[in-house]
């Protein structure tokens, strides 16, 4: 498989995936194939949303495709925002508003405020559907820390670290993140399939 479509319009995710794959697979984003549609995420699970997006692109363009969905699951909030992480503060999506809402919801919760980030990737190719999952445990900080990354990165501190994803820099984050773990599984699968 030489080229693979990544069903996203999110430039941060696209760059992160390309960086993690280190050029071993050519990744093409949706706008590079002329797809400007916002693919609805209406499933109740991360796997379901990833599959919806991958199926949409695969059916429309007939190309091997993968999509991901990521959720931040906070123990004190019964695993919320979870599958609703991107739209936690409502539509349209707004990362800063999502983080503010999360910190407000946790304002009376004592530390450590345990959480995990989960990414599920759905790949559709000529051989069928394949799923890969990455998960990292951590805690939620009291306030935003750092200026790197995107989404909930400024408030998520991975287990075993003292820096938030936003503080630790792209290189370190891309070695340990939930997405990195899922993409490593995808990469290994693709390289074995060659």
Swiss-Prot record:
Q: What's the protein called, per UniProt?
A: dITP/XTP pyrophosphatase
Supply one GO BP term: nucleotide metabolic process
Q: Name one Pfam family in it.
A: Ham1p_like
**Catalytic activity as recorded in UniProt:** XTP + H2O = XMP + diphosphate + H(+); dITP + H2O = dIMP + diphosphate + H(+); ITP + H2O = IMP + diphosphate + H(+)
Q: Which keywords annotate this record?
A: Hydrolase, Magnesium, Metal-binding, Nucleotide metabolism, Nucleotide-binding
Q: Name one GO cellular component term.
A: cytosol
Q: Which Gene3D superfamilies match?
A: 3.90.950.10
CDD domains given in the database record? HAM1
What cofactor is needed?
Mg(2+)
Coiled-coil region(s): none
Q: Where is the active site?
A: 69
Residues at which substrate binds: 8-13, 70, 150-153, 173, 178-179
Similarity comment text for this entry: Belongs to the HAM1 NTPase family.
């Amino acid at each position: 498989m030489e080229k693979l479509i990544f069903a996203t319009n999110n430039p941060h995710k696209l760059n992160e995936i390309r960086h993690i794959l280190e050029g071993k697979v050519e990744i093409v984003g949706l706008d590079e194939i002329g797809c400007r549609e916002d693919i609805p995420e209406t499933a109740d699970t991360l796997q379901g949303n990833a599959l919806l997006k991958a199926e949409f692109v695969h059916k429309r363009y007939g190309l091997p495709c993968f999509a991901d969905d990521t959720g931040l699951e906070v123990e004190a909030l019964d695993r919320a925002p979870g599958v609703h992480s991107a739209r936690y503060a409502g539509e349209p999506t707004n990362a800063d508003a999502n983080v503010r809402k999360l910190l407000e919801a946790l304002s009376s919760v004592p530390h450590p405020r345990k959480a995990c980030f989960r990414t599920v990737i759905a790949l559709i190719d000529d051989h069928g559907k394949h799923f890969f999952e990455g998960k990292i445990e951590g805690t939620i900080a009291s306030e935003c820390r750092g200026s790197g990354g995107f989404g909930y990165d400024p408030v998520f501190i991975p287990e075993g670290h003292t820096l938030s994803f936003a503080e630790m820099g792209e290189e370190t984050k891309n070695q340990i993140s939930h997405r990195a773990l899922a993409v490593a599984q995808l990469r290994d699968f693709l390289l074995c399939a060659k």
